[in-house]
């Protein structure tokens, strides 16, 4: 995993360490990010974060993944001695993802991540413009009872994610296997 780009930030902290108040902004220009979880590089990252009091607002956020585009917006409220409150939106168009060699998909849609950290909800609509899955499906492996449940990374006891995402794909899903 790696990233690059030009980062400019100006942040002022007032008050005490127990009750700090922040003001300022941060921006990223000509950024790029490579994640181990997807083959595509996230490019042309342009973002501006405005910080006021205990609120971080994304006033501008754009990137390109493959030939597709992503727009980000929303904000986070930093709550003292409590989980932060999140309301983030992503709108994406013709984004191609290849999370592994067996799956290639292109999608458009809108996703919102809302709630307090530890109890987040992902809501939205995703249209699969095309999906091609090429891995062999072994029914014995799928139906065999697992000895223990699969672990969920990033969640502590008592934390949860709620998912309400509508996924639609009409006449463009291709499964090549067995």
Positions of PLM-derived features:
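Membrane-proximal interfacial segments on either side of biological membranes
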Residues: 1-57, 73-178
């Amino acid at each position: 995993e790696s990233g690059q780009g030009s980062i400019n930030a100006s942040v002022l902290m007032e008050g005490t360490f127990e009750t700090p108040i922040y003001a300022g902004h941060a921006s990223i220009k000509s950024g790029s990010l490579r994640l181990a979880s997807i083959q595509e590089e996230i490019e042309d990252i342009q973002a501006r974060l405005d910080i006021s009091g205990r609120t971080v607002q994304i006033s501008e956020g754009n990137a390109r993944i493959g030939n597709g585009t992503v727009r980000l917006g929303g904000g986070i409220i930093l709550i003292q001695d409590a989980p932060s409150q999140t309301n983030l939106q992503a709108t994406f168009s013709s984004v191609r993802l290849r999370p592994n060699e067996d799956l290639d998909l292109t999608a458009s849609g809108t996703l919102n991540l809302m709630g307090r950290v530890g109890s987040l909800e992902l809501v939205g609509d995703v249209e699969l413009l095309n999906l091609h899955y090429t891995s062999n499906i072994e029914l014995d492996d799928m139906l065999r009872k697992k000895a223990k449940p699969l672990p969920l990374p990033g969640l502590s006891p008592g934390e949860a994610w709620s998912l309400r995402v509508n996924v639609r794909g009409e006449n463009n899903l291709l499964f090549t296997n067995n």
